């Protein structure tokens, strides 16, 4: 199966949605109660199948001895091996090095997000992995695996200056690291070509400005200027003729689109856009250096395939019009590929090979109890000021409506919710709760104009959108207004605290996970490497603490100062090593609530950080057992007697 480089365009899987779901059906018998461990610590979990560059081996993540690690096998003999990572913590992802003998993966220390790059061998899987970035207190990741150079990888690291990232060429045999691109203090992102040479960079050029520069004539030269919102730019790669750059960019347009930009002139050619939403991700061919597929998410997932041969192969994997497809990996010759096929019930993984039928490699453990899982429906809510808010509703199977509702608020706020399998959503639905997710104003994915509607609207119109979503669910007979919880992590945790303090009459209880309680102290404690990426947007959207009016605005929108207004129970959960939102945010909120005599329960994990996917399964199970007990007490849902 050689994937042709032509640009035959095939739009897959783009559907509309209903703004009004069908009326609640009469309740049938509820499904069996699914054990906590099957959602959050399953021994059957497996994902991330990737074929090696030479096409001879396959590797994936699966469970082993109470944690996730990397398995691999020979495609010819089916012989399976296990890489011993010599750590009790979970592995979440990996990449093949230049051949089938080595894999690369990241690990931090107890969730602190100071990631190190590790190299492990499939030839000696029991040998201790090699730390390629043994620099204490630093954050590193693999920027590029150079296919033509089996001895080196390009690594980004803040080794020299904790606030910015340089590029290093690291010898994976000797661990020698050579600095190849030093950050002058204002570079936000780098692009290297297919041989690992720095070719483009994005610079912070002022409070609301960015500059795209290219390496030309022995130095860096300006190519394009951006404002802050146009800075939603992704540097993808160099074009096949070496004269252009592939970018995902919203410069001069509302939606993020795939562009070709000429290196000499900066002239743009629009290659692909979605008519309704941003293009989120592009798969480039390592062989042809041309785009293979574009991914977007209008309501259900949409995959736009540029290559007609690949499109025909992927079409054979479609189960339904709502099926999502992701290309996970290809070998160097693009004769073999691994593909993820997903629905709202779970995932299946396939090997595509030229001249052969698709071969199933694995399926998520959830497929064994898919019949007990709920359906995720795209919805549209109209806000009080007439804005169309897209989101998702998951109604519990077998329960009468109206019933208890959990408003699940995504973090960010510069991200969005997507359709698909979400273990937290399905866990809550299995306990008898309807789950409502809304992409409130400011969520990414819906264009620049929608994102900018959030400027100045923390604890304002962004929160109004959440309240309007609850009212929508109540008006349609989905939610009992006396049994509504608000639950979120990170920004979503902040939103949960806002809900419990600014609108305490709306919510029966709230769950705040790694949330912000004081916007001023939060900004003062952000990691140094956020100064170029996150900080400018915070200043624009929320407020500038260096100015008196900015400090006043931040404090006015901080739940901490309204702890006395809380009326109902709150559960607060935080990882002690959180690098993004300091654990102090939860500690000070808990102290204020306790001083005011409020009903609050606090759970802290000393060996975790900010991630929703815990490094230790034991912590994940305890977290969700706490949530299960808390929601059962305040909303009346089901709970298990043990893990």
Where are these regions (language model features)?
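Short beta-strand element of the alpha/beta-hydrolase
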Residues: 401-411
């Amino acid at each position: 199966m050689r994937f042709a480089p032509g640009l035959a365009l095939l739009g897959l899987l783009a559907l509309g949605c209903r703004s009004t779901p069908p009326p609640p059906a009469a309740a049938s018998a509820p499904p069996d109660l699914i054990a906590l461990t099957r959602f959050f610590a399953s021994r059957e979990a497996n994902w991330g199948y990737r074929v090696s560059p030479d096409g001879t081996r396959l590797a994936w993540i699966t469970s082993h001895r109470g944690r996730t690690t990397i398995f691999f096998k020979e495609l010819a003999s089916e012989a399976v091996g296990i890489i011993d990572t010599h750590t009790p913590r979970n592995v979440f992802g990996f990449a093949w090095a230049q051949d089938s003998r080595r894999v690369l993966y990241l690990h931090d220390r107890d969730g602190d997000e100071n990631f190190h790059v590790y190299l492990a061998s499939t030839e000696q899987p029991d040998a201790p992995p090699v730390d390629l970035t043994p620099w204490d207190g630093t954050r590193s990741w693999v920027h590029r695996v150079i296919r033509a150079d089996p001895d080196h990888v390009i690594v980004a690291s803040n080794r020299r200056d904790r606030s910015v990232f340089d590029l290093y060429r690291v010898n994976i045999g000797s661990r020698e690291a050579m600095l190849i691109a030093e950050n002058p203090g204002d570079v936000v992102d780098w692009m290297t070509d297919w041989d690992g040479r720095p070719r483009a960079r994005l610079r912070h050029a002022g409070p609301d400005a960015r500059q795209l520069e290219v390496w030309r004539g022995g130095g860096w030269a300006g190519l394009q200027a951006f404002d802050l919102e146009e800075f939603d730019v992704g540097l993808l790669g160099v074009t096949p003729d070496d004269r252009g750059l592939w970018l995902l960019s919203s410069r001069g347009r509302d939606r993020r689109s795939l562009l070709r930009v000429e290196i000499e002139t900066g002239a743009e050619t629009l290659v692909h856009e979605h008519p309704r939403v941003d293009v989120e991700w592009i798969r480039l061919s390592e062989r042809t250096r041309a785009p293979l597929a574009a991914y977007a998410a209008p309501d259900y997932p949409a995959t736009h395939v540029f290559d007609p041969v690949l499109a025909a192969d992927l079409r054979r994997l479609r189960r339904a019009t709502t099926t999502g497809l992701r290309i996970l990996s290809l070998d160097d010759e693009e004769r073999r590929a691994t593909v993820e096929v997903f629905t709202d019930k779970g995932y299946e993984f396939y090997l595509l090979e030229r001249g052969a039928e698709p071969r199933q490699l694995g399926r998520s453990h959830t497929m064994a109890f898919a019949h007990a899982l709920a359906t995720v429906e795209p919805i549209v809510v109209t806000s009080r000021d007439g804005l169309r808010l897209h989101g998702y509703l998951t109604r519990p199977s077998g329960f009468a409506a109206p019933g208890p509702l959990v408003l699940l608020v995504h973090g960010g706020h510069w991200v969005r919710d997507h359709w698909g399998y979400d273990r937290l959503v399905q866990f809550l639905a299995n306990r008898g709760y309807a789950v409502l997710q809304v992409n409130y104003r400011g969520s990414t994915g819906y264009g620049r104009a929608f994102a900018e509607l959030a400027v100045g609207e923390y604890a304002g119109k962004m929160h109004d959108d959440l309240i309007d979503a609850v009212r929508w669910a109540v008006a349609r007979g989905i939610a009992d207004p006396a049994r509504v919880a608000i639950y979120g992590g990170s920004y979503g945790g902040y939103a949960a605290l806002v809900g419990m303090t600014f609108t305490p009459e709306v919510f029966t209880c709230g769950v705040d996970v790694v949330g912000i309680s004081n916007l001023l102290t939060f900004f003062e404690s952000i990691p140094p490497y956020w100064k170029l990426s996150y900080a400018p947007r915070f200043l624009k959207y929320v407020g500038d603490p260096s100015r008196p009016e900015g400090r006043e605005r931040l404090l006015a929108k901080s739940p901490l100062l309204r702890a006395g207004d809380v009326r109902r129970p709150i559960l607060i959960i935080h990882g002690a090593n959180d690098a993004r939102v300091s654990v102090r945010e939860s500690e000070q909120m808990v102290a204020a609530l306790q001083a005011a005599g409020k009903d609050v329960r606090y759970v802290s994990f000393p060996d975790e950080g900010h991630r929703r996917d815990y490094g230790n399964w034991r912590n994940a199970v305890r977290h969700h057992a706490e949530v299960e007990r808390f929601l059962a007490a305040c909303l009346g849902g089901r709970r298990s007697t043990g893990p």
